[in-house]
Amino acid sequence: MEHEQELREFTISSVNELGLTAGEVHAEQFMRYLIHLIEWNKTINLTSIIDPMEIIIKHFVDSLVALVATSFPQNGVVLDAGSGGGFPGIPLKIMRPDLRLVLVEPVLKKCSFLNSVIGLLKLEDVSTFDGTIEQYAKQPPRHVIDMVVVRALKYEEIRKHIPALLTSKGKVVLYRAGAIKNEEIGIDFHLVSEIALMLPQGFGKRVITVIEKNI
């Protein structure tokens, strides 16, 4: 890829600007992911963003904001609802390889892409499910989920299916543009925290809302 070294340095500096610690190993994985994403995006609609630097900030770094806003349990099981091109799940896994990840994606071609990324990056303890959250919830339990991350989907549309997936006191991490309203949270959950953070390079604000299962 043209300007690859510049993009590596840009990735490291942008992630570090969040308050995380990224090095060459992380940059290598993000670059391989970036190149693979751009190539597959030529035939599958994975993202409308085509500029590499914008992908780095608006997808990779944006996905990592949750690591600053809240704590993820060591070796915790995290379900990415509507993973699409792998956001936020795969960037989270790159920075937190201890996490056990479930990527739920209903579009078969996108699920194929996710499986190819898992193989390319040699990611361990990552599985995919070709279906919706509703369909996943109806399956025999595969994992006890500690956290559900929701970035691409509307939380209100999948809210009723989430409680059955979560362990007691399990959490949902919502990537939002603005604050959540009390009536949007639902009777099965309560608000734990809500933090607004600015993305690096002046790319705007991201709100991370964390809600917890009541029992």
Question: Where do the PLM segments sit?
Answer:
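Class I SAM-dependent transferase core
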Residues: 1-75, 79, 116-126
